[in-house]
């Protein structure tokens, strides 16, 4: 049971999450997560997509009230579209609420004009995210008045479910799409860790309506998944697994990382392996002169490794006290989480 209880520590864990917004808008983003165990790209990508499209909280218009109009199968004097078309257009209005309680907005317009979402009087607690969205066409000398109720919710709620709210006569319930995420797509590519090239890289494309940024939406979806899965953890970690003393070593735990986990060329990796350079600590203790005396190791390989070490503020010829430790294999595994 002890070995099984440590199973999750043997899997590679993602150590890089990159967010890239599209230049034309902050509502679209590309999210790259790597490296992942083979198969985990599809597992996480599908789970995140389903949560993003179904479980995030947002705001939407849930009902409207137009004077002298009692149902959606009516027509409004002076309005080109019938009530059903107007409702369909209203469903496309994207709103952001700064409070949890429902709010009633008002719309007043005089023709001739194209009535747009930006003409709605929202107050301080509600914001229209797509003010140019068209609601209807109003004829000359005609007036249109309307009350619109918006609420906070999640997912897609049919208008039939709104009848539970005991709407007054004349107030028409409409289908409400609360989710602030408009679209999510993902793909999985290969990525390299050391000499292994078939780990997964998860690439997600997320677009929101502006109520929440894509980065925040992804974070919220991950938190929802975390909370839902927490119940399945039916055991406790051993105390020694929880408390790893990172101050017990006279050198940085990262030096216990194996050099084959660095993204080296095959030639450089083989040279290090043939010279019995296994850990980063072994590598940084060597001088440049030592490395150039290694068989088949040239200036090109030297510069390649120097660039990689520089990314971690490391260099050749470093003084590493008490290196190598006697139980280096045990320490390398024990401090794995410290340098991941």
Swiss-Prot record:
Q: What does this protein do?
A: DNA-dependent RNA polymerase catalyzes the transcription of DNA into RNA using the four ribonucleoside triphosphates as substrates.
What are the EC numbers?
Answer: 2.7.7.6
Q: Which organism is it from?
A: Rickettsia peacockii (strain Rustic)
- InterPro entries with a match to the protein in the record: DNA-dir_RNA_pol_insert, DNA-dir_RNA_pol_RpoA/D/Rpb3, DNA-dir_RpoA, RBP11-like, RNAP_asu_C, RNApol_insert_sf
Could you tell me the gene encoding this protein?
rpoA
Among the Pfam families in the record, one is RNA_pol_A_CTD
Protein name per the record: DNA-directed RNA polymerase subunit alpha
Subunit organization: Homodimer. The RNAP catalytic core consists of 2 alpha, 1 beta, 1 beta' and 1 omega subunit. When a sigma factor is associated with the core the holoenzyme is formed, which can initiate transcription.
Which leading EC class covers this enzyme?
transferase
Sorted keywords for this record are:
DNA-directed RNA polymerase, Nucleotidyltransferase, Transcription, Transferase
Catalytic activity, as annotated:
RNA(n) + a ribonucleoside 5'-triphosphate = RNA(n+1) + diphosphate
């Amino acid at each position: 049971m002890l070995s099984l209880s440590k199973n999750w520590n043997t899997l590679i864990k993602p150590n890089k999450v990159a967010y890239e917004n599209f230049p034309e808008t902050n509502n679209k983003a590309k999210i790259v997560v790597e490296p992942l165990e083979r198969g985990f790209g599809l597992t996480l990508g599908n789970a995140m997509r389903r949560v993003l499209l179904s479980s995030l909280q947002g705001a939407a218009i849930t009902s409207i009230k137009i004077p002298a109009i009692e149902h959606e199968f009516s027509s409004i004097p002076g309005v080109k579209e019938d009530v059903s078309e107007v409702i369909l257009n209203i469903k496309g209005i994207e709103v952001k609420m700064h409070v949890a309680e429902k709010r009633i907005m008002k719309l007043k317009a005089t023709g001739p004009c194209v009535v747009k979402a930006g003409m709605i009087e929202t107050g301080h607690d509600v914001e229209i995210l797509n003010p140019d969205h068209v609601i209807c066409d109003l004829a000359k000398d005609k007036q249109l008045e309307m009350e619109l109720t918006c609420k906070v919710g999640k997912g897609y709620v049919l208008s039939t479910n709104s009848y539970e709210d005991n709407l007054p006569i004349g107030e028409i319930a409409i289908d409400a799409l609360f989710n602030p995420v408009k679209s999510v797509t993902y793909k999985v590519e290969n990525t390299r860790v050391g000499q292994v090239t078939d780990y997964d890289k998860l690439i997600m494309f997320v677009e929101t309506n502006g109520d929440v940024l894509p980065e925040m939406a992804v974070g919220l979806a991950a938190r929802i998944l975390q909370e839902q899965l927490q119940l399945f953890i039916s055991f406790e970690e051993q105390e020694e697994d929880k408390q790893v003393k990172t101050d017990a070593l006279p050198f940085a735990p990262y030096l216990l990382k194996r050099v084959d986990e660095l993204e080296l060329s095959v030639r450089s990796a083989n040279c290090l392996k043939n010279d019995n350079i296994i850990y980063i600590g072994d590598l940084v203790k060597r001088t440049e002169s030592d490395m150039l005396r290694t068989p088949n190791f040239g200036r090109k390989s030297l510069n390649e490794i120097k660039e990689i070490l520089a990314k971690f503020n490391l260099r050749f010829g470093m003084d590493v006290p008490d290196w190598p430790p006697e139980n280096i294999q045990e320490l390398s595994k024990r401090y794995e989480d410290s340098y991941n």
